[in-house]
Curated annotation (Swiss-Prot):
Residues 516-525 have a biased composition (Basic and acidic residues). The chain crosses the membrane at residues 12-32, 457-477. One of its GO terms (cellular component) is plasma membrane. This is Sensory neuron membrane protein 1. Residues 1-11, 478-525 are cytoplasmic. Residues 33-456 are extracellular.
Length: 525
């Protein structure tokens, strides 16, 4: 049976409608998801792999140092007053070297190489790195804190060590040029024959203190970042490639061949999350992203905050913080014991750095008031001092990230050492670092061409097909019924006869005759 022409059009429209739905909402998403899985895995010779191995643009590396303005008063127990100096801006170039693939377990091993270049033109107004800053003497404070924890009976010996190595300092503060403490290094004279200084220097070398370079003639050179610059980190990192399971891409599975570290207690030693340079795709607002920080020997969790956008691309913003160790059971394994956990927002990283220091968000953002009230001059701001990361959720591409961390030390009070006996016994800030990444125009354009332009084209096509198909169906059905109605009307008109009252015939012509016209009968009363 042949369909009427309007119904043919309706059938074609219905086919287009169904095809549009299948293409736009079923087939294309499957193809796109499959393509993303292929592109986002760390396969050899892919664009992502090349970018992952050697980031083709510099990251922002900004250092802010706290200058102490009331040193004499602090030595007498007064609350420290600080003034932030910075930023000192450096380009940070990141590369992974000695990269090896392991097909059998879908992993890659590599070592890390960072190179820093100072950019005075992008630093704070007039900052050259030659500014003299007064800050807590990290070495003196660290020596005393370490002995006070391990062998407090030896504090008198430590005082002799300090006087011998640092030439009888009058306080616990360091006067130093900014570039010296950041990269060039300050000299620690360990060329001493006296027992106390020599013993202290021997222990320092044995412990392989972070940030120290050991030079000839028993000269040590200490800096905050100098040992990282243009030096291959000896640690061998193992991560998943994500070829077998894209949701595993970048996941840290071993460090120096060991499946976990041996620093903290319980599950805090586990590698949870990626290496921080690549993340899995298909992110939702329910996901809690995790990455492992090799600098701090721990994993950080980030949670969804809000929808954002970056250069016209829709993104999800995730935020993170240091944590509340005293009240979060999941984090208490970072403490020596649950009873020794520090207040909210501050973490003891002594076991990680082998230096008695603490980390927090800059300016003690989101830190307990018992800590923040001990220092004047801080102005915490979530926008300036928080940890944030904006991801394109479909591909998991990191578009804009700002990792900020402040390093602090304790002004320990003890009667055993003269320059320590009146200190305020508080945790104080030393410096903080902003490490940021902004995906440049080249890679934003690449992402748009590979992902969003095809997605938008298919989006336009699918809605066009659905709209066209729906209109065609409605139009076909409408015209079909219109033709039928008109046909029925025409048929009814052709079978109806006109009755002529002058025609005396009683023949029925297409109508029923009920009766002849006649006068009503007369009724006689």
């Amino acid at each position: 049976m042949l369909l009427p022409k309007p119904l043919k059009y309706a059938a074609i429209g219905g086919g287009v409608f169904v095809f549009g739905i299948l293409i736009g909402w079923v087939i294309f998403p499957v193809i796109l998801k499959s393509q993303i899985k292929k592109e986002m895995a760390l396969s050899k010779k892919t664009d992502l792999r090349q970018m992952w191995e050697k980031v083709p643009f510099a990251l922002d590396f900004k250092v802010y140092i706290f200058n102490y303005t009331n040193v004499d008063e602090i030595q007498k127990g007064a609350k420290p007053i600080v003034k932030e100096i910075g930023p000192y801006y450096f380009e940070e170039w990141k590369e992974k070297v000695e990269v090896e693939d392991h097909e059998e377990n879908d992993t890659i091993t590599y070592k890390r190489l960072d190179v820093f270049h100072f950019r005075p033109d992008l630093s704070g107004p007039g900052l050259t790195g030659e500014e003299v800053i007064i800050m807590p003497h990290l070495f003196i404070l660290a020596m005393v804190a370490t002995i006070n924890r391990e062998k407090p009976s030896m504090l008198n010996v430590v005082e002799k060590s300090i006087n011998g190595i640092f030439d009888n300092p009058k306080d616990v503060f360091l006067r130093v040029k900014a570039m010296d403490i950041m990269f060039r290094g300050i000299i620690i004279n360990c060329d001493r024959t006296e027992f106390a200084p020599k013993a202290a220097c021997t222990k320092m070398k044995k412990d392989a203190v972070t940030g120290v370079i050991y030079e000839p003639n028993n000269q040590f050179r200490f800096s905050l970042f100098g040992t990282r610059n243009n030096t291959v980190n000896p640690d061998v990192v193992t991560v998943k490639r994500g070829i077998k399971n894209i949701m595993d891409v970048g996941q840290v599975v071993a460090l120096n061949g060991k499946p976990q570290i041996d620093i903290w207690r319980d599950h805090c030693n586990e590698f949870q999350g990626t290496d921080g340079t690549v993340f899995p795709p298909f992110l939702t607002y329910k996901d809690r992203l995790q990455s492992f920080s090799f600098d701090l020997c721990r994993s950080f969790k980030a949670w969804f905050q809000k929808k954002t956008s970056y250069k016209g691309i829709k993104t999800n913003r995730y935020i993170a913080n240091v944590g509340d160790f005293a009240n979060d059971p999941e984090l208490q394994c970072f403490c020596d014991t649950p009873d020794e956990c520090l207040p909210k927002g501050i973490m003891d990283i002594r076991k990680c750095l082998k230096v008695p220091m603490y980390v927090s968000l800059p300016h003690f953002l989101e830190t307990d008031t018992s800590v923040t009230n001990q220092v004047k001059g801080l102005t915490p701001d979530p926008n300036e001092h928080g940890i944030i990361a904006d991801f394109e959720p479909l591909s998991g591409t990191l578009m804009d990230a700002k990792q900020r961390m402040q390093y602090n030390i304790k002004l320990l009070r003890t009667d055993k050492i003269a320059i320590f006996k009146d200190l305020p016994d508080s945790i104080v800030p030393c410096f903080w670092v902003h490490e940021g990444i902004l995906l440049n125009k080249t890679f934003v354009k690449m992402l748009k061409h590979q992902l969003f332009i095809p997605k938008r084209i298919v989006g336009v096509i699918r809605w066009w097909m659905v709209s066209f198909g729906l209109i065609a169906v409605l139009a076909g059905v409408m015209y079909h019924f219109k033709d039928n109605i008109m046909g029925w009307a025409a048929k009814g008109e052709s079978t109806t006869a006109k009755v002529n009252p002058e025609d005396g015939s009683n023949e029925q012509r297409g109508v029923s005759v009920i009766g002849q016209d006649r006068e009503p009968p007369k009724v006689t009363m």
